[in-house]
Design a protein with these regions (language model features):
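N-proximal low-complexity "stem/linker" segments adjacent to membrane-targeting elements
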Residues: 1-28
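Glycine-rich, basic loop-to-helix element that forms the pyrophosphate-binding segment
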Residues: 67-83, 96
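Short aromatic/hydrophobic "clamp" motif used to bind/position activated sugar donors
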Residues: 88
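Donor-binding/catalytic cores of nucleotide-activated saccharide
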Residues: 96-211, 215, 227-233
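Membrane-interface aromatic/basic loop that binds lipid-linked glycans or pyrophosphate carriers
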Residues: 114, 252, 281-346
Length: 346
């Protein structure tokens, strides 16, 4: 019988002692047994490292590496350098997957000779679960359709703007199965979050999708993404500068690869939508200071230029009102709508 292809499951771990056993149990109990589980303890200050060691001693498929804290991108890059499987899967240390995930993903990849397999996920809050729909049914993607997936990593276009809250639903690296050879051949890696703030997954996928010829989507909710509501907001001083680096990297990629006008428009839309994140970040301040921060964001040249070209026709009323305030440079309106969003989020 032909040997089944190995899946290398990469698990970055940082201070998740409370959830780590659930994650690891979901991996060691996969119905598809030909897996290696590569865990990188990114300088955890809790008992995460000890838990990893316990699992590593009891299951030969688990490799554990303890490193000084350098962030999730560094941890994933390190783990990737040790991977030997045909396929790569990422699972964060506080999340978990269904026990049939590897089996279903590998079957789909082999069935369609897919360079990428994707599936939706469930956001797991302390008191409820919320499925995140990506596509409504099973799909395969070829050539031009894979290019559209890549463009989605830059930003939304057209009717996609009807749901700005889903801008990055497709962009995670968990909920996907990758070909290790494709990653290695093209030297694809994760960017340091100290430089770009967030969205290391999206940049990874942007570069990976440039080389994907066939992709497949399974409509089963196989991944579980833990969301802890009620967390205290903390102001991220460097976020605006980091996102400028992110946008600059995207723009450089678009120009270098001659991606086209649709990628440019998608980036402008991403820059506009990022006002939401920057505004929510500002709400960590008292009201007067938060309002001053929001005025500063709205007056920035890059945001003024992007918001000027943002199409409004597809937005539902609440988003239309928010971006109308942005276009009008009406900081007080933006502030009040952000406060409403913050309350709704929890």
């Amino acid at each position: 019988m032909e040997q089944t292809p190995m899946v290398s499951i990469i698990v970055p771990v940082y201070n998740v002692e409370r959830y780590l056993r659930q994650c690891l149990d979901s991996l060691v109990n996969q119905t598809y047994q030909n897996v290696e589980i590569i865990c990188v303890d990114d300088g955890s200050a809790d008992s995460s490292g000890e838990i990893l060691n316990q699992y590593g001693e009891s299951d030969a498929r688990i490799s554990v590496f303890h490193v000084e804290n350098a962030g999730v991108s560094s941890a994933r890059n390190k783990a990737l350098s040790y991977a030997s499987g045909k396929y790569i899967m990422y699972v964060d240390g506080d999340d978990w997957i269904d026990v049939c995930t590897c089996e279903k993903a590998v079957f789909k990849a082999e069935e369609h000779a897919a360079d990428l397999v994707m599936w939706p996920y469930i956001r797991e809050f302390p008191d409820h679960s919320a499925p995140k729909v990506i596509f409504s049914e099973e799909k395969t993607f070829h050539a031009a359709e894979c290019r559209e997936l890549q463009r989605r990593m830059i930003g939304l276009l057209g009717t996609e703007l009807a749901h700005p809250e889903n801008a990055d639903a497709l962009c995670t690296v968990w909920g996907k199965l990758y070909l290790r050879e494709l990653i290695a051949q093209n030297d694809i890696h994760f960017t340091d979050l100290q430089r770009i703030g967030t969205y290391e997954d999206g940049l990874f996928n942007l570069h990976y999708l440039a080389h994907v010829k066939n992709a497949a989507y399974i409509p089963d909710y196989l991944s579980h993404y833990r969301k802890n509501s009620g967390m205290t907001s903390k102001y991220r001083k460097e976020l605006a500068a980091q996102w400028k680096n992110l946008f600059s990297d995207m723009r450089s990629y678009i120009e270098l690869e001659k991606c086209g006008d649709d990628f440019d428009a998608a980036l402008n839309n991403r820059i506009s939508l990022s006002i939401i994140g920057l505004g929510l970040n500002a709400l960590a301040f008292p009201s007067r200071e938060a309002l001053r921060e929001i005025r500063g964001i709205l007056s920035e040249k890059e945001y003024r230029a992007a918001i000027k070209t943002l199409p409004m026709r597809y937005f539902p009323l609440h988003w239309w009102a928010f971006f109308a305030c942005c276009k009008l440079n009406f900081a007080s309106g933006v502030f009040l709508l952000l406060k409403c969003m913050e309350r709704i989020k929890g």
